[in-house]
């Protein structure tokens, strides 16, 4: 669907009081910038926030989404801080998924659980234990220390999970701490595929050319 149609519909809802603001989620950076320019030309409401998945195991938003949000003064609310539970220590092996876990559903969820990601989660857990913290709180704290982050969306299933995650706000990481995380997964790289905006991947949004379409 053309972005002008989407923005026109959002403008209708905003002007009639059905919504207060408009934002986007998991958009490629270029699509968000395109929408901002269309909103300028047409006097439509502008996106105020982008909501992508982001964790230590997939840092690719640092290449374009983060600088875009900084340049255009957009909020950045990230989700999946525990990388589908990998950073919480839920998985012990790439081919051994707990019953009821998302990875046990196979498909893309299983592909996101990698041996490298599990190894990194174990290192994070060891560092957290040495500092009197939990791996989950430390993983969220790491995100809160990154540039441009407005908020982190969490999904606790129990009150105990919530209390643990909220402890992240009390953790202060030093430059040496942050440098240590960078040795595990360098800035802008990934070890687990959670957010791929390549336009020619098999599940690319409708309307974007694939490599094969382009070749024809």
Give a label for each model feature.
Residues 99-126, 130, 145-149, 159, ...:
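Terminal-tail/helix-coil boundary detector
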Residues 61-100, 134:
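Aromatic-lined glycan-binding groove of carbohydrate-active enzymes
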Residues 16-17, 72, 131:
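Helix C-cap/helix->beta junction micro-motif
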Residues 7-11, 32-36, 66, 121, ...:
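Generic structural signal for well-ordered alpha-helices
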Residues 1-60, 64:
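Glycine/proline-rich, positively charged
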Residues 25-26, 80, 133, 152-155:
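Active-site-adjacent beta-strand anchor residues
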Residues 2, 22, 50, 69, ...:
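Conserved, mostly hydrophobic/aromatic
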Residues 28, 54-58, 80-87, 142, ...:
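Glycine-rich beta-alpha junction loops
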